Amino acid sequence: MTTTETLESPRAIAWRRRRQAVARTWREFTVQKGALTGLILLAVTVVMALLLPVLSDESGLDVTKADGGALNPPSARYWLGTDIDGRSVLLMTLWGARISLLVGFSATVLSVLIGTLIGITAAHFGGWTSTILMRFTDFFLVLPSLVLAIALSAVLPHGVFTVIVAIGLTAWPSTARLVRAQTLTIESRPYIERARALGGGHLHVVGKHVLPGVLPLVLANTTLVVGNAVIADATLAFLGVGDPNAVSWGAMLETALNNGAVTRGAWWNLLPPGIAIVLVVLCFTLVGRGLETVLNPRLKK
């Protein structure tokens, strides 16, 4: 221990080391150009989605107020053309980012919370608790998640909240198994035994030692789960089981297919939402892989 550390309180030392770890992680992350590019594009997309109500008028999405012709090609007035109802495809694509990202982030938070809770509980307590929770997890793993999400969306009232719940309740098993494996690794280390020998209870061991060790891996996995949630949301909307009143990228694809945009060669109704989905998922994947490379010691070698 250095002289500086002896003059600091244990809490101050812990916070300083955490700041140093965060700074080191950020430096290692920024070295990866693909991950950094993905993060920048995601930041621009999220900021644009948040500021869109200030920068644009949502009334342009109203079919009764649309003043463009049906399926007009891209022009100086409508950069990405219009849909079957005369609405601007560019405006719909921008507003669709709000719903798609909202569902993606919200469903991911729900699934990660469920998966982390089940994974830590199963690994920490072991025994019959682990057996029951893991069999429950395996049951959800063997079920087709998309089919289960469609069933939930069909049974529950249609709406954005229903889509979030349907995706969140079907996307957690992989996170649970990942967290359980990491928790078992952490709890096999000597400092966990010392904490228990000193009288540390379950909450102390999990909160002070297990959870901080699991969170970096959960963070890296979360970015990948968001991309999967965005795809699931687009799929549900495309199949017609999403929110019928919401403008999302999947709903745009579903509308284009049902209204004959494909048969009429109106590619501008298909490419913008399709490219938006691909780019957002690609960016989340790049960021997730970058974080995994930084936070997983085995991938650094």
PLM feature spans:
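Hydrophobic core positions of alpha-helical segments in small-molecule transporters
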Residues: 37-41, 103-107, 133-136, 149, ...
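Short hydrophobic alpha-helical segments within the ABC transporter permease transmembrane module
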Residues: 89-93, 136, 179, 192, ...
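Generic hydrophobic transmembrane alpha-helix motif, especially the helices
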Residues: 79-83, 89, 110-115, 120-189, ...
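Transmembrane alpha-helices
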Residues: 98-114, 203-235, 284
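Gly/Trp-centered helix-boundary motif
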Residues: 1-116, 120-121, 128, 146, ...
